[in-house]
Amino acid sequence: YTFTDMDQFIRRSTVPEPLDLFFGLMAILLLLEISRRIVGNTFTAVVLGFLLYMYFGNYFPDVISHKSYDLGRIVGHMYMTLEGIFGVPLSVSVSFVMLFVVYGTFMDVAGAGGFWLDLSLATMGRQSASAGRGAVITSALLGGPQGSGVATTMSVTPIMWPILKKAGYSPNMAAGLIATGGIGAVLSPPLMGAAAFLIMQFMGVSFWDVIVMVTVPTILYYVGTLFMVELEARKYRFAPPETEAKTVRQVMLSQGYHLLSIAVLVAILVVWNKSPEYAALGAIGTTVLTSFLSKDRNEWLTPRKIITAMIEGAKNMLPVAVLLAAAGLIVGTFTLTGLGLKISSIIMYASGGSVLAAILLAMIASMLIGLSLPITATYIMTVVMVAPALVKLGIPMHVAHLLAFYFAVLSEVSPPVGLSPCAAAAVTGGNPFGSMMQAWKYSLPAFLVPFFFSTTTVGYSLLILGGNWLDFILATMTSLCSLLFVALGIIGYLRKKLPMVERVLLIIAAFVMVISPIGWSIPGLAPLFAGILMILHHLRVTRGPARKSEASV
């Protein structure tokens, strides 16, 4: 019905005919029911709430009220234009996300998951921090091609939990650590989840630009987690892993061909400057061809395996497609009612024109939205509400979008709702809420990362698209030191237990470095040097082996 007479169909959107109204209502109601079954009750209730807001807009407080729209206008806007169901989110789903999800499935069927696992185990080493380090590296390597926090967590937990358990990690600690690494998969190139493609579409930039922008923040996310792992291993004296892992050379010689498809994807995007669709198709074709280099015939992508991969890819895509179609109803509400501009005005007023205050409000809003919505929906709502205010305050558009994306990812790890920690706890036997708190603990340094690249012009250079190399080096050095200071303050251990005064001072130094202008100035460098001097002093006055402790929940 929709495509029988498309031109006239769109023209009737402001005054739908009875048949338009019937099919439009059916489409919206069916979408809500499918969303309830696949995505969940909470998300569907939020979408329904926005639809009710359109109908009863004049009953809301003055700051967000609007003239109410009748049923015909709502259905016409949501069903008969490119602003609602068939808007940008669903367009991105069909054009880009589908192909990359299928690409990830092809890699999985071809045995790439085993390659990433073997490679991470080969890099673990045999130190006390090796088990935790291996869990984080495995999540980072496996998560990049998967692009899903929960999927990565569920893939890594059964393999890494026995290793972490032998090292001395409690069930809650292990679940929290693996979940923290898994959630970082949504930030990790090349897939990064559906939100990355929405950034590309909303901003009108290339997919390669998005990959470049997220690279350094993603590295900082994992570096902050690794700082926590290394210091915690010192504190609790975890045992080194007992697994007989292959060497990196052995892994690369036997399975390194899995990297070829990623190389082809990057080459098509960068060298030939083609669209993400071409890149995904080229990567899928390369995966099929290189699968025959495997010594295990079960990993060969024969016609039967290709069909299996396509079926599994379609199944994996279903929740994403439904979520993005339903998210179109939320976006349509903002475009019709002007709600985004109203909320932006509220943020401008509440922040008093302060960039830092506006970013804090954006973080709080994202955390609250993330309590009930998945990452992609959280990003969409955060960006339409917050980005206009941030841009008015002078933050570049690409920085505002990446802020919304990063905060949406962090909302997934924040209590009291966290799917990845709960999923990991089901395997380790830990307490779900305790696992969430552990995941939150491991990710605390990462909460500083958005402030690094958004509060100053020097910090913008971390996204590589702006600034110069001197700014980039200075911002990177400052960011790494801040992450280390926060990790030391939280864990409270270096060679021995840190005094509470030093822990507090290190955390204060890290925050001062965030809120003060980064640069060759006293406000920017004083807390940096103060923190470094405290660490050097502690290293000089402490001698002897660290005290053995028991890992606690």
Q: Locations of the language-model features?
A:
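Long hydrophobic segments that form regular secondary structure
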Residues: 256-399, 406-407, 487, 496, ...
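Core transmembrane alpha-helical segments of multi-pass membrane transporters/permeases
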Residues: 33, 38, 48-63, 71, ...
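Membrane-interfacial loop-to-helix junctions in multi-pass transporters
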Residues: 18-22, 82-96, 122-135, 167-173, ...
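Transmembrane alpha-helix interface/packing and boundary motifs in multi-pass membrane proteins
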Residues: 36, 104-108, 139-148, 180-186, ...
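Hydrophobic mid-bilayer segments of alpha-helices in multi-pass membrane transport proteins
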Residues: 21-30, 41-73, 94-102, 257-265, ...
